[in-house]
Amino acid sequence: MSVNYRLGALGCLDLSSLSTSDITIDGNLYLRDLVLALQWVRDNIAQFGGDPDNVTIFGESAGAHITATLLAVPAAKGLFARAISESPAAGMVRPRELAVEFAARFADLLGARPRDAASALIRATPAQLVQTQHRLIEQGMQKRLGAFPIGPTFGDDCLPVDPVEAMRSGQSHQVPLIVGTNAEEGRLFTRFLKMLPTNKAMIDELLADAEPATRERITAAYPDYPKPSACIQLGGDFAFNAAAWQIAEAHGAHAPTYLYRYDYARGPCAGPDSVPRTPPNCSRSSTSTGPRSVRCLPLPPTGDMRCGSATT
């Protein structure tokens, strides 16, 4: 089953710092929505033939990040038995100090003075909130690549600790976890959502504050850099693969954790540095090695790549 939860500025932007003595605004509203949905499943799923003690939560990309985050939400304890996080996105969790900054920017873009921000939020239409959200995202990405304002904030009753730190210290829900990514995660983002560093200019911006030796070590890890294929790989590693590896290593120290990688073959017309115009029609499954505390999925080999439907 799937659930609806509040998105963007309506649920994923922490505006709690704009609360007043008579208007209380909670943070992490979308996580609270998901906890309520899981509680509903616990209380009602048996009526539909389900087993409330055998619930698996899973998601892809932003959904994968939410899945991993729920592992660190105290109120979600006991509401699921295992989790699958497919291509979790990095850089979406923020401390309260940064959330306060984003909230102030949001109020300013909405045209509200700080002391009137809470009432302005109540008066604003959903369309105005969404439009302001898009402006905030664009502004944040211009100021610093990867500064994405939409996502969970840690430091409140809903999410007390950064999820990866909670996993690392054993404070998260220690249920079996599958986590992994796909080959060339950054390739799709070369055509839309220019928020991933998938070209040299964006990578230079990303690494602008890094020490020269650090920049050299990072780019040296991609022998073909700055060719497009290497930039795309670096962008995918930054946004998705690094997050999956961190989650796997942290969670794997305390609970069964399985790290996977899904590979595909590009069509015969795609050159090494080209971007496919349509999804490739050849694929295969594979596993990757990970941290020693992480087990690899025992997937059987699929043999030669074959055109047509993906084989598993």
Describe each model-derived feature in a short phrase.
Residues 6-13, 215-223, 283-286:
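Active-site-adjacent bridging/hinge elements
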Residues 43, 77, 86-205, 231-249:
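Substrate-access "cap/lid" subdomains that shape
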Residues 1-115, 166-189:
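Serine-hydrolase-like catalytic core of hydrolytic proteins
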Residues 181, 209-243, 248-253, 258-264:
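Alpha/beta-hydrolase fold catalytic core
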Residues 11-19, 193-195, 276-283:
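Short, flexible, mixed-charge acidic loops at enzyme active sites
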Residues 23-28, 89-94, 163-164, 225-238, ...:
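Active-site rim elements
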Residues 242-245, 249-312:
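Mobile gating loops/cap/lid regions near enzyme active sites that modulate substrate access
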Residues 32-35, 39, 97-101, 173, ...:
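A structural signal for well-ordered alpha-helical segments within the folded catalytic domains
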